[in-house]
Amino acid sequence: MASRRSRPQAASFRNGRRRQPTSYNDLLRMFGQMRVRKPPAQPTQAIIAEPGDLRHDLNQQERATLSSNVQRFFMIGHGSLTADAGGLTYTVSWVPTKQIQRKVAPPAGP
């Protein structure tokens, strides 16, 4: 009975339901290999996802959810997540401090 537990993430993708990415492996599974640079001495920008990595279109809430999860994992100050036809681009501005800020833009209404 070693394989009693099924793989919920695989089943969720098969059923078309998207679950929140909660770990680095989930992010890699969804968006492919990401490139991350260590925080430099002064604030700069880094793109940790290449165009074309997006497996599906993200709606506004999924963008906020993924943005929140990515920020929580990388312990960054603030960032912005944009999804378009080219793919996913997550741009972060590193802040030279150990304080963790969570800054997720509210969904844009019509």
Curated annotation (Swiss-Prot):
Record flagged with keyword RNA-binding: yes
Keywords assigned by UniProt, alphabetized: Ribonucleoprotein, RNA-binding, Viral nucleoprotein, Virion
Region (Disordered), start-end ranges: 1-24
UniProt keyword annotation of ATP-binding present: no
Molecular function per GO: RNA binding
Family: Belongs to the arteriviridae nucleocapsid family.
Protein name, per record: Nucleoprotein
Species for this entry: Equine arteritis virus (strain Bucyrus)
Gene name, Swiss-Prot/TrEMBL: N
